[in-house]
Each structure stands twice: as structure tokens, then as C-alpha cells.
């Protein structure tokens, strides 16, 4: 086991323990997009199940969105060799996105909503206890700033949440993992990564701008990323302007 994998194991098991993400006997589906993050999470979590750290029934779900150039042959081989239960489901969400999004606009928002809808539907149909997503620490940091700058809300990606209908529980075991470690791990493991030819081809996305902003700030103060992350668990309601929060503090 490489140093990088040991590091990933440490932070993933810490998040699972700290936020009580998994329970014994869980039937859990890991959403494998074909990118470095979900591949890294799968490899580490599969190893933790193999060595009996976790007693869960793991199923891998991949959504083929019918994008041009999609080739999952190497992904299938990887999953077969790993020996995990999996399903690659084909849905033409690409056609919907191309039809609905005006030329010049970014696809990410609609594409992610359609993908999320299919994930939730599949989880319900197969009675999954948990939906496992591969978002990492940097995703949380960027999402917080994006919510503030572009939506006027203070929110990000929680380690665990239940959907509004109460049907699905979503968990993110990599909330403490840095993207740079996942990049290194992907190089070490040579994962058969499938690039996104839809949103990946679009420049000047908001997330890229926010990522660059954080990187620039970190050059002046390396603690900026960790400070942003820590702010998500160090909330001072009395110092905010939410009337409902302030009223609840007074009552």
C-alpha cells in the first residue's frame, strides 16, 4: 500500500467515524462517474471492506449519459477485475441538455440535476440505504464560496444529508481529502478515467474561477483553504443576519 493510499484511508475512515456515515449491514451504492475522485474512493473503500473495516454491501453505479465519445470498456474491465457488483445504466440526458440549454450557456447545472435525479431514482428502486458520492475537501470549499458569491446563501456539501422526500441518504466520505492526493493516487493506480466531453470542454466556468481565486489567496496565506473548510463547522449564528436564527436564539 502506497503512502498516498494510507493517507486517503486515514481521512476517509476519520470522516466516516466523525459523521457516522456508515452502519453495519448498509446496502450502499457508490456513484462512479469515471473520474479520478470516484475511482479513488472506490479503490480505498473496497480495500476497507476487504480487510473487514466495514461490513457493508457495496454496489457501484455508473450513469452513461450518452455523451459523444463515451467508452466504458476499460471501466467495465476494471470493475470486473476488482470483483465488485456494478451496473452501468444508459440514459440520454446528453440529448436533453443539448436541447434545453441555449447556445453559449454552460451545461453543468441541468446536467447535474438530471444525473442526480437518475441516481435518486435508481437508489429508491434498489432499496439502497446510502448513496456514496466522491466529493472532496476542495469541492466543499469551492461550493461554499460559489453559494455566497453567486446565490447569496451560506451552504456547501454536507458529509451526510437526507433528501427532502426522506427517501435517500447521501454521504460524502472524502470531505477531509485534498484533491492533490487524489490526483497523485490516480497516477499511482493508473485508473481508466473517462473524461467529460460535455462540461469539460467549456471554459470560464464559475467553479474554475472560484478555484483560481482560492489558489491565489493560498499563495499569500496557505491556511486559507483549511480556514474556509473549518468555517463550515465553526458557525456563529449570533453574528449572522438570518432573522429566523436570531429569533430562535432569543426564544
UniProtKB/Swiss-Prot annotation:
<feature type="binding site">
    <location>
        <position position="108"/>
    </location>
    <ligand>
        <name>[4Fe-4S] cluster</name>
    </ligand>
</feature>
<dbReference type="InterPro" id="IPR035107">
    <property type="entry name" value="tRNA_thiolation_TtcA_Ctu1"/>
</dbReference>
<dbReference type="GO" id="GO:0005524">
    <property type="term" value="F:ATP binding"/>
</dbReference>
<keyword id="KW-0067">ATP-binding</keyword>
<keyword id="KW-0694">RNA-binding</keyword>
<protein>
    <recommendedName>
        <fullName>tRNA-cytidine(32) 2-sulfurtransferase 1</fullName>
        <ecNumber>2.8.1.-</ecNumber>
    </recommendedName>
</protein>
<dbReference type="GO" id="GO:0000049">
    <property type="term" value="F:tRNA binding"/>
</dbReference>
<comment type="similarity">
    <text>Belongs to the TtcA family.</text>
</comment>
<keyword id="KW-0408">Iron</keyword>
<comment type="function">
    <text>Catalyzes the ATP-dependent 2-thiolation of cytidine in position 32 of tRNA, to form 2-thiocytidine (s(2)C32). The sulfur atoms are provided by the cysteine/cysteine desulfurase (IscS) system.</text>
</comment>
<keyword id="KW-0820">tRNA-binding</keyword>
<keyword id="KW-0808">Transferase</keyword>
<dbReference type="InterPro" id="IPR011063">
    <property type="entry name" value="TilS/TtcA_N"/>
</dbReference>
<keyword id="KW-0004">4Fe-4S</keyword>
<comment type="subunit">
    <text>Homodimer.</text>
</comment>
<dbReference type="InterPro" id="IPR014729">
    <property type="entry name" value="Rossmann-like_a/b/a_fold"/>
</dbReference>
<feature type="binding site">
    <location>
        <position position="199"/>
    </location>
    <ligand>
        <name>[4Fe-4S] cluster</name>
    </ligand>
</feature>
<comment type="pathway">
    <text>tRNA modification.</text>
</comment>
<dbReference type="GO" id="GO:0034227">
    <property type="term" value="P:tRNA thio-modification"/>
</dbReference>
<dbReference type="GO" id="GO:0051539">
    <property type="term" value="F:4 iron, 4 sulfur cluster binding"/>
</dbReference>
<keyword id="KW-0460">Magnesium</keyword>
<dbReference type="Pfam" id="PF01171">
    <property type="entry name" value="ATP_bind_3"/>
</dbReference>
<keyword id="KW-0819">tRNA processing</keyword>
<keyword id="KW-0479">Metal-binding</keyword>
<dbReference type="GO" id="GO:0005737">
    <property type="term" value="C:cytoplasm"/>
</dbReference>
<dbReference type="GO" id="GO:0016783">
    <property type="term" value="F:sulfurtransferase activity"/>
</dbReference>
<feature type="binding site">
    <location>
        <position position="111"/>
    </location>
    <ligand>
        <name>[4Fe-4S] cluster</name>
    </ligand>
</feature>
<keyword id="KW-0411">Iron-sulfur</keyword>
<feature type="short sequence motif" description="PP-loop motif">
    <location>
        <begin position="33"/>
        <end position="38"/>
    </location>
</feature>
<keyword id="KW-0547">Nucleotide-binding</keyword>
<dbReference type="GO" id="GO:0000287">
    <property type="term" value="F:magnesium ion binding"/>
</dbReference>
<keyword id="KW-0963">Cytoplasm</keyword>
<dbReference type="InterPro" id="IPR012089">
    <property type="entry name" value="tRNA_Cyd_32_2_STrfase"/>
</dbReference>
